[in-house]
């Protein structure tokens, strides 16, 4: 090799060495991952904010529109949007193992089960009681399921944050003047709301499991929600679709499909890349807070003092999970760096 070429070769070698070191450096890798907008807990909180608009939007539906039909319409259209815009949904089935295909099917069943159980629970117990039972039980179910399946034992931080968030959520929506039911709650309605929380915890945990196994988030959620959208079509058709003929009905269905299903679950899938499912379900307890604030600002409802106190406790619990811990064990940091590297490979 000519002598005058050696400096150029040396410079290239040094550049390649720096690139190789930076790609292996956990600190630099973490910085590159964190540059992505709305990733991790922030993406999940944004999704929860979109979900919080569901109640306000559903009040604008035409009178007589069945609640189950409204929810099924949003899932059917939004689920198909997620499926059609996920380019890797078809290759995903081929890339999955047999056990992972079973997980996809179970996840789709859980997605379809949520509106089928939640909306009847609302009709029996009221919005406040159904919301606090479904969303309050979901983090508990997620933590227990993750523990039972060997995906991580819930830590003290998760337990403290979940306890604060559930208590704050309960004070927020069950304060006097908000629940709307003076008598005892309907037992079947409570059971249906708890089943809705279990459904939500199941498909969150399944989605996180498949993403952690190396599958991209968008195809995973697209496959689950596309199949679930097809599954709830009979519910929509049996409940009646006349309300969709009005502009208000069409606008509500479009909002539920585009914002609270398509966009919200895209953000949720992005957040699941680096957030454990049990923490993600706790973060989604921001949904009733957003729904309550919208009810005050848009619908003119008034909150008692206990609800404002509950809102503060809920915010503190969510902040406990959103703000990174200042001190972590070295092993935890190394596992986080390895997961970040896996996520970068998935999203390329």
Question: Which residues are covered by each model-predicted region?
Answer:
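Hydrophobic core positions of alpha-helical segments in small-molecule transporters
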Residues: 46, 73, 106, 133-134, ...
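Alpha-helical transmembrane segments of compact multi-pass small-molecule transporters, enriched
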Residues: 77-81, 133-148, 227-231, 282-298, ...
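Hydrophobic transmembrane alpha-helices of multi-pass small-molecule transport proteins
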Residues: 82, 154-176, 294, 306-325
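A helix-boundary/kink motif common to multi-pass secondary transporters
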Residues: 66-67, 126-127, 153-154, 215-216, ...
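Hydrophobic/aromatic residues within transmembrane alpha-helices
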Residues: 61, 70, 121, 148-150, ...
